[in-house]
């Protein structure tokens, strides 16, 4: 289901929350959405912004006001946007962002303010965040288990990892160690790269030299293609696994 078709259901569900009687009786529902429409993750944020055209103008007779801001994938900018939603827009609901690091930042603000937050990217829902934050994408442990089971079925014993040098990369690497390693696989080598990087040649050479049975790429959006194309150019012939965060029209 498209995440923004789901957002209408999210708003409707929010109206039923006991903690939000004021919002249910309001003259309008204000939704602040911070997404990444510029920078390396724009391939994720632009479709999210465009999908807002399909958000209904009202639910249950209550008008909906949607305010959209760009954070460029920067946690600091996402924090600023979220605080604007709280202090200036008086938002009833906050959504965003498009990638994990700024989503964590938005969650922090939403939880401080006591405003429902719906993340559009996977992020760790710690006990202190669970009261106000929900991650809309499929949880990484669920998606990861399917990948690791496929690896096991294909006799993969050693796995090389290359992922973002941020919280999204950490989530996937830690999940592989938690679920994949107990299935009988070992980490051959771990490499990282930054989202804006235009080359991962050095990391690819190390991965090729390690010659693992498979390589897991913990990246999202257009930049997730960079390690895969580089690995093939450097002669890697093994299996390459992408995550569900890599899915985009540009990829």
Language-model segments: which ranges?
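Extracellular/periplasmic Venus flytrap/periplasmic-binding protein
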Residues: 80, 124-126, 131-235
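Structural recognition of the beta-strand scaffold that forms the well-ordered cores
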Residues: 30-34, 65-68, 92-97, 116-121, ...
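Sec/Tat signal peptide C-region and signal peptidase I cleavage site
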Residues: 17-24
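Beta-alpha junction/loop-to-helix N-cap segments that form part of ligand/metal-binding clefts
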Residues: 28-30, 43-50, 58-126, 193-200, ...
């Amino acid at each position: 289901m498209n995440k923004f078709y789901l957002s209408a259901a999210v708003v409707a569900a929010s109206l039923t929350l006991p903690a939000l009687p004021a919002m249910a009786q309001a003259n309008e529902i204000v939704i602040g959405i911070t997404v990444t429409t510029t920078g390396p993750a724009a391939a994720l944020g632009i479709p999210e912004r465009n999908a807002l055209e399909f958000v209904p103008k009202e639910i249950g007779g209550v008008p909906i006001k949607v305010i959209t801001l760009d954070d460029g994938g920067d946690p600091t900018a996402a924090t600023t946007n979220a605080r604007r939603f709280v202090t200036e827009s008086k938002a009833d609901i906050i959504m965003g962002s498009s990638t994990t690091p700024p989503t964590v930042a938005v969650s922090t603000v939403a939880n401080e303010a006591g405003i429902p937050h719906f993340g559009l990217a996977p992020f760790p829902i710690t006990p202190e965040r669970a009261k106000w934050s929900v991650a809309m994408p499929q949880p990484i442990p669920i998606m990861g288990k399917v990948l690791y089971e496929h690896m096991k079925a294909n006799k993969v014993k050693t796995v090389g990892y290359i992922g973002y040098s941020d919280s999204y990369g950490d989530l996937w690497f830690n999940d592989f160690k938690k679920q994949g390693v107990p299935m009988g696989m070992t980490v051959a080598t771990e490499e990282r790269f930054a989202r804006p990087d235009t080359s991962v040649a050095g990391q690819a050479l190390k991965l090729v030299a390690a010659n693992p049975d498979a390589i897991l790429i913990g990246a999202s959006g257009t930049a997730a293609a960079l390690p895969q194309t580089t690995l093939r150019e450097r002669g890697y012939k093994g299996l390459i696994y992408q995550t569900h965060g890599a899915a985009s029209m540009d990829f």
